[in-house]
Amino acid sequence: AAVDVYPKEPSKNGEEFVTPLREFDNVILTPHIGAGTEEAQRNIGTEVAEKLALYSDNGSTLTAVNFPEVSLPAIRENVSRLLHIHKNVPGVMRQINEIFAKLDINVAAQYLQTTADIGYVVMDIHSNEPEKVVPLLKQIEGTLKCRILY
């Protein structure tokens, strides 16, 4: 599900947004986007839908406002793409790569960007069983979310 308008919204920037919907992995919450004209509303709706589809389909977060921006190439054959969101602290990338090394998994590509607080790394790996890697990545201290994109 995706939600853009909420019964009780923050009244100003920086105010914490609290809703029980934040607990669910299958819910996407976007900021309420106002528009002055029907055309602007349509265009904003189209742009938001395109950005969500791009994130959903390939992991790109280009033009994200409060999240690290990562622009990704098209899907490559014979790789699995993993998404890892973590606290931006020293040592996370080392631990991620140590897991791949211990499992003898070749990393085809890694794309990392950070903000002051959050790190977002997208990894294309050569593995027939990427589902075995995710539980290990989730155990890394500071991991906020990790999943297989494809």
Predicted regions and their residues:
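A conserved regulatory-domain signal marking ACT and ACT-like small-molecule sensing domains
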Residues: 62-150
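Rossmann-like dinucleotide-binding domain for NAD(H)/NADP(H)
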Residues: 1-74, 120, 150
